Swiss-Prot record:
Belongs to the universal ribosomal protein uL1 family. This is Large ribosomal subunit protein uL1. GO terms for molecular function: rRNA binding; structural constituent of ribosome; tRNA binding. Part of the 50S ribosomal subunit. Binds directly to 23S rRNA. The L1 stalk is quite mobile in the ribosome, and is involved in E site tRNA release. Protein L1 is also a translational repressor protein, it controls the translation of the L11 operon by binding to its mRNA. It comes from Syntrophomonas wolfei subsp. wolfei (strain DSM 2245B / Goettingen). The gene is rplA. Gene3D superfamilies: 3.30.190.20, 3.40.50.790.
Length: 233
């Protein structure tokens, strides 16, 4: 894959093999970001698990103390009094069969979907459509619930879902380039702490094998995983 001039120049400003302290790595990411938009800052953590085994799955949610910097559009499948609750809590779209029909027609103008348990008969039919896009409501992610008000407010405030992929890597946004380094570090620590708490009992050896932070358009800066784990025990 051919990289642009800015990407190549950014990679010359630091040692790609060095394992940096978390704060120093985030400072470097901010320094080398040159895009003309407010890039997302991401973290990618390789875990010492084998995702092929059910007892080594890592999945959950975490509320980032400083949010992600992105305004998320929340869609809610609900009926009865829960419709009003969702609207008052700030949901962008609320409905039932009407929303299902729009989605089946190719509409996806939302970032996260929430459903009350009594709407899963409707939502379940769209598993093959929503699932591959990461939009399917799921009890483990806290998006199938009757506690609509709290869930919407948490999602709007910066609650994110994470899940280990087939390569045993977990990916997450931890803010924007415009965030102060301390705010990014607080979000990184919150995410790392959540991952440590979610460690499967079956995981063996060093849990965090590698940690990389980057912005949307910049190369990754490596963080010493042992330092990050020690700071968030």
């Amino acid at each position: 894959m051919k990289r642009g001039k800015n990407y190549q120049q950014a990679g010359e400003k630091f040692d790609r093999l060095t394992l940096y302290e978390p704060k120093e790595a985030l400072e470097l990411v901010k320094e080398i970001a040159k895009a003309k938009f407010d890039e997302t800052v991401e973290v990618h953590i390789k875990l010492g698990v084998d995702p092929r085994h059910a007892d080594q799955q890592v999945r959950g949610t975490v509320s980032l103390p400083n949010g992600t910097g992105k305004t998320r559009k929340v869609l809610v499948f609900a009926k009865g009094e829960k419709i009003k609750e969702a609207e008052l809590a700030g949901a962008d779209y609320v409905g039932g069969e009407d929303l299902a029909e729009k989605i089946q027609g190719g509409w996806f103008d939302f970032d996260v979907a929430v459903a009350t348990p009594d709407m899963m008969a409707v939502v379940g039919k769209m598993g093959k459509i929503l699932g591959p896009r990461g939009l399917m409501p799921n009890p483990k992610a806290g998006t199938v619930t009757f506690d609509i008000e709290r869930t919407i407010k948490e999602l709007k405030a910066g609650r994110i879902e994470y899940r280990v992929d087939k390569s045993a890597i977990v990916h997450a946004p931890i803010g924007r380039i415009s965030f102060e380094v301390d705010k990014l570090q607080e979000n990184l620590n919150a995410f790392a702490e959540a991952l440590l708490k979610a460690r499967p009992a079956a995981a063996k050896g060093q849990y965090m094998r590698s940690v990389t932070v980057c912005s949307t358009m910049s190369p990754g800066v490596k963080i010493n995983p042992l330092v990050l784990m020690a700071a968030n025990k």
